[in-house]
Swiss-Prot record, chain A:
The modification N6-acetyllysine is found at residues 60, 83. The modification Phosphothreonine is found at residue 13. Heme b binds at residues 64, 93. Red blood cells. This is Hemoglobin subunit gamma-2. Gamma chains make up the fetal hemoglobin F, in combination with alpha chains. SUPFAM superfamilies: Globin-like (SSF46458). It comes from Sapajus apella. Residues 3-147 form the Globin domain.
Amino acid sequence: MSNFTAEDKAAITSLWAKVNVEDAGGETLGRLLVVYPWTQRFFDSFGSLSSPSAIMGNPKVKAHGAKVLTSLGEAIKNLDDLKGTFGQLSELHCDKLHVDPENFRLLGNVLVTVLAIHHGKEFTPEVQASWQKMVAGVASALGSRYH
Amino acid sequence: MSLTKTERTIIVSMWAKISTQADTIGTETLERLFLSYPQTKTYFPHFDLHPGSAQLRAHGSKVVAAVGDAAKSIDNIGAALSKLSELHAYILRVDPVNFKLLSHCLLVTLAARFPADFTAEAHAAWDKFLSVVSSVLTEKYR
């Protein structure tokens, strides 16, 4: 599905090198929970998610967000085999976590928005297009072993 | 789904800032749309879509002006966009899935240009507002 050109890979890896995975992870997951409140359904054990500030400051949200983005970082090293990289995680998300793959698309777009906030002009339409390919590839890979 | 008072305040106050860059925001949004989602170009076979094209600029302006109209009449978006709603239903017939794509690209453009204003709360308000606009534009489809 997603075939990354040399330009795509360059755009993705060079921007990723500037990302603080912990901060970006917390912000991305936090914004998902704020902008699409129904996604909170997966996080009953996370404590207070009662307001945007509670969510964005919640230490469990930050920690889990960092975990998710760290995993994405691994994917970036393996852009040509996203399905292989995410095989086991796909099974986990289906069999144990029961996450609708639509949530992967939502999270991917929130990440793109967070990158835009932190990189402004550098996040050109061309760079965005490469990243959209990336998050679409990840979403597809994570959904690939659903049954 | 309707906008809370707080959400309306956020949209209206941000719109005041945004409106000064409306034209370039429109152009950038469309550039992002056509690059990230090439299938959306199928609605514009009659356009020159190269970055910087006059048609792209003109159309971008139109799109953002309509968003502005919705913001200015945020208490009655349905009335403000009624003609545009009919246009999309009977003439343009853009598949509803594309409104989400355009909304996302507009959000990304705003996030890149107004990072300090684009808090999580503002992000949520804008996503919801554009969702309401999209609903209005597709409500006469069938």
